[in-house]
């Protein structure tokens, strides 16, 4: 796409991000199911107040990425990675990885700098 900087390169990733933990398909499937369950719980508990919309977007991005990679793993036994920043020799990744990474980074930012402890009380497992 941009010679020497950004290329499309086909790679079959049987591991986690950046090729770690190869051949652990069941583990990744279970992690994805746990993440989706946690997101479903948080969405269920989330007030409909517009203040929580950025949080919902982050959770949906993480879910979309998890589902995208899970579909690849279940249907093919591996995730297809194809985006490669050659300039910095960054590990090959895919769009689902972008969704998970950006969603998680924004989620951390929101929790650290936007929401207060009392905003997050609605997600507590304790009876209120």
Predicted segments — roles?
Residues 1-128:
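Alpha-helical transmembrane bundles and membrane-interface segments of multipass inner-membrane proteins
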């Amino acid at each position: 796409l941009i010679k020497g900087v950004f290329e499309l390169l086909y790679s079959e990733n049987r591991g986690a991000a950046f090729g770690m933990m190869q051949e652990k398909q069941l583990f990744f499937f279970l992690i994805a199911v746990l993440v989706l369950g946690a997101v479903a719980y948080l969405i269920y508990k989330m007030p409909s107040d517009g203040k929580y919309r950025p949080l919902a977007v982050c959770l949906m991005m993480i879910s979309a990425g998890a589902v995208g990679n899970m579909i690849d793993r279940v249907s093919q036994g591996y995730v297809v990675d194809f985006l490669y920043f050659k300039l910095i020799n960054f590990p090959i990744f895919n769009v689902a990885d972008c969704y998970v990474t950006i969603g998680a980074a924004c989620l951390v930012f929101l929790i650290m700098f936007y929401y207060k402890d009392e905003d997050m009380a609605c997600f507590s497992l304790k009876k209120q």
